[in-house]
Amino acid sequence: MSGNGNAAATAEENSPKMRVIRVGTRKSQLARIQTDSVVATLKASYPGLQFEIIAMSTTGDKILDTALSKIGEKSLFTKELEHALEKNEVDLVVHSLKDLPTVLPPGFTIGAICKRENPHDAVVFHPKFVGKTLETLPEKSVVGTSSLRRAAQLQRKFPHLEFRSIRGNLNTRLRKLDEQQEFSAIILATAGLQRMGWHNRVGQILHPEECMYAVGQGALGVEVRAKDQDILDLVGVLHDPETLLRCIAERAFLRHLEGGCSVPVAVHTAMKDGQLYLTGGVWSLDGSDSIQETMQATIHVPAQHEDGPEDDPQLVGITARNIPRGPQLAAQNLGISLANLLLSKGAKNILDVARQLNDAH
């Protein structure tokens, strides 16, 4: 009898209710805020589980004197976190989706994509230029951005401005803007500013005609071990179906173009009346040469937790077992079709030249 009692006690200790789920994140304040929001949602869904947040620095956090596009290494903000995932030191990792490459290392998958916040870019102005827009900034004003995508589009749109690289986390960039006289304004992701509670610093939100956004911008991705079915089931509740389908289309477009950090590629997606609209573009580094096109596809946005595919093969690095396969494939095909259209119009040449120029500098 006593033996059975011990077995029952052991089973209770090993039951999922007692389990601590370890969540990996970057150390920056924004990353911690984003991770806290994901953990809060998981806690609400699984009140019996405990969650421990483990923060670590990544290569991208450490190399702050070089433009991201020049470092010449993929997975700048993800490699150390993936290493911890691989060694079973954490069970899942919360990322900004735009930091996750469209091809993940073997053994990993994006197990959830959370509801997207505003994906557009924002302009934050130096205190002396508050009330201005990019259009009304004085001639030769210097605007800071760490992104080739932003610089290429904005140089084309605002030729009277000069664009220079600015690195560091959000706090560091804002301090550089406010305390030094080098920059009249800087460009940042609206979602990051909003998550930090800095709505009052948003001086201008850039519309798609001015600057399309990065693939996955404004959404959070939760990376897990691809074979860890328990954790895949656990994080599945975080999937937002519309965000998922938009981001599958965007990531398929980028992957098929073979774009990345070192080339200016941008997108804009919208879901309306059962249609998914995808606009994508590529630019030369100075913005003088560009190709942009829009395509659409009829896609039914499923309700969360309709029964999805059981075999769960990944699409552009994403596993969404609780979302039907048909809409996911339709979104992926839309991204591939748009990429093929741009490639047929000469996108590869623009991107190759951009890559060579970026590598040469």
UniProtKB/Swiss-Prot annotation:
<dbReference type="GO" id="GO:0048034">
    <property type="term" value="P:heme O biosynthetic process"/>
</dbReference>
<feature type="modified residue" description="Phosphoserine">
    <location>
        <position position="147"/>
    </location>
</feature>
<protein>
    <recommendedName>
        <fullName>Porphobilinogen deaminase</fullName>
        <ecNumber>2.5.1.61</ecNumber>
    </recommendedName>
</protein>
<dbReference type="GO" id="GO:0006785">
    <property type="term" value="P:heme B biosynthetic process"/>
</dbReference>
<keyword id="KW-0597">Phosphoprotein</keyword>
<comment type="function">
    <text>As part of the heme biosynthetic pathway, catalyzes the sequential polymerization of four molecules of porphobilinogen to form hydroxymethylbilane, also known as preuroporphyrinogen. Catalysis begins with the assembly of the dipyrromethane cofactor by the apoenzyme from two molecules of porphobilinogen or from preuroporphyrinogen. The covalently linked cofactor acts as a primer, around which the tetrapyrrole product is assembled. In the last step of catalysis, the product, preuroporphyrinogen, is released, leaving the cofactor bound to the holodeaminase intact.</text>
</comment>
<feature type="modified residue" description="S-(dipyrrolylmethanemethyl)cysteine">
    <location>
        <position position="261"/>
    </location>
</feature>
<feature type="modified residue" description="N-acetylserine">
    <location>
        <position position="2"/>
    </location>
</feature>
<keyword id="KW-0963">Cytoplasm</keyword>
<dbReference type="GO" id="GO:0004418">
    <property type="term" value="F:hydroxymethylbilane synthase activity"/>
</dbReference>
<dbReference type="Pfam" id="PF03900">
    <property type="entry name" value="Porphobil_deamC"/>
</dbReference>
<keyword id="KW-0007">Acetylation</keyword>
<dbReference type="GO" id="GO:0005829">
    <property type="term" value="C:cytosol"/>
</dbReference>
<dbReference type="InterPro" id="IPR022419">
    <property type="entry name" value="Porphobilin_deaminase_cofac_BS"/>
</dbReference>
<keyword id="KW-0808">Transferase</keyword>
<keyword id="KW-0627">Porphyrin biosynthesis</keyword>
<dbReference type="GO" id="GO:0006782">
    <property type="term" value="P:protoporphyrinogen IX biosynthetic process"/>
</dbReference>
<dbReference type="InterPro" id="IPR000860">
    <property type="entry name" value="HemC"/>
</dbReference>
<comment type="pathway">
    <text>Porphyrin-containing compound metabolism; protoporphyrin-IX biosynthesis; coproporphyrinogen-III from 5-aminolevulinate: step 2/4.</text>
</comment>
<feature type="modified residue" description="N6-acetyllysine">
    <location>
        <position position="74"/>
    </location>
</feature>
<keyword id="KW-0225">Disease variant</keyword>
<dbReference type="GO" id="GO:0006784">
    <property type="term" value="P:heme A biosynthetic process"/>
</dbReference>
<dbReference type="InterPro" id="IPR036803">
    <property type="entry name" value="Porphobilinogen_deaminase_C_sf"/>
</dbReference>
<feature type="modified residue" description="Phosphoserine">
    <location>
        <position position="69"/>
    </location>
</feature>
<comment type="subunit">
    <text>Monomer.</text>
</comment>
<dbReference type="Pfam" id="PF01379">
    <property type="entry name" value="Porphobil_deam"/>
</dbReference>
<dbReference type="InterPro" id="IPR022418">
    <property type="entry name" value="Porphobilinogen_deaminase_C"/>
</dbReference>
<comment type="similarity">
    <text>Belongs to the HMBS family.</text>
</comment>
<feature type="modified residue" description="Phosphoserine">
    <location>
        <position position="15"/>
    </location>
</feature>
<dbReference type="InterPro" id="IPR022417">
    <property type="entry name" value="Porphobilin_deaminase_N"/>
</dbReference>
<dbReference type="GO" id="GO:0006783">
    <property type="term" value="P:heme biosynthetic process"/>
</dbReference>
<keyword id="KW-0350">Heme biosynthesis</keyword>
<dbReference type="GO" id="GO:0005737">
    <property type="term" value="C:cytoplasm"/>
</dbReference>
